[in-house]
Amino acid sequence: MTLPTNVTIVEVGPRDGLQNESPVSTRNKIRLIDLLSDTGLSHIEAGSFVSPKWVPQMADSKEVMQNITRRASVTYSALTPNLQGLEQALDAGANQVAIFTSASEGFCQHNINCSIAESLKRFEPLMVQADKYHVPVRGYLSCVVDCPYDGATSPTQVANISQALIELGCYEVSLGDTIGTGTPNRVKEMLESVLARIPSQRLAVHFHDTWGQALANIYQALSMGITTVDSSVAGLGGCPYAHGASGNVATEDVLYLCQGLGIETGVDLELLAKAGWMISDELQRQPTSKVSQALRHRME
């Protein structure tokens, strides 16, 4: 088994994390992103231009993105559901955007009120406009292992929708285990199916730690050639389908794993942990990251 020498971390805490937490002030969101920008991260998902009616925690994304201190080495991206969201994101200074659909019909209907096929059709005008502006588009694919409504997701279905997103024009597809039920054997089966169609360089993994399997699943993905991992500082973001359970895998834990495996990320673990402590203190809770907790205990 050969592991990659380098891994890119996509920090999703300021968006995917905070949208599932109690509200945080605009000032503290800006502060968090500025701290993260100083850690060596190359990609931070900074906001979302979904209707505030659906995601009220992200209503200030424009103000946040227009007031962060930008580093030339960092990509600041935003989630955009449609053409209007794209225009708003670009106006706010996003230099990359992301679209989202699901590998499961049930989740697609519950989450974005349409079929998978309809969701892909809706993205076509956005993709045309993004191409016109030379803005890269990332595709998020939810429920690649299981769905809270439909049960197990077929690996072939995951491969089909991943391929559709690539054909639509996405430079990369992030494969999301939305309810965190995946285990390495199931992740292996899913990735084998997707990798038969799409090269590893155009795939990322996005694991939730709801059932404590995220790091094991990331290790499995790394062993299969995946070199981009989504994660959230301090483990921000609960799981909306399991009340009180953890959601996104913590960036600190992923960094420690990579460090131990001799994989370069370019990210300073201690600086990132400090950013996590700041936002966790604001939220008045502990980081879900075990590495973060151990580091804080050691430094106190």
Please give the residue ranges for each predicted region:
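Catalytic cores and adjacent flexible loops of soluble metabolic enzymes
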Residues: M1-E300
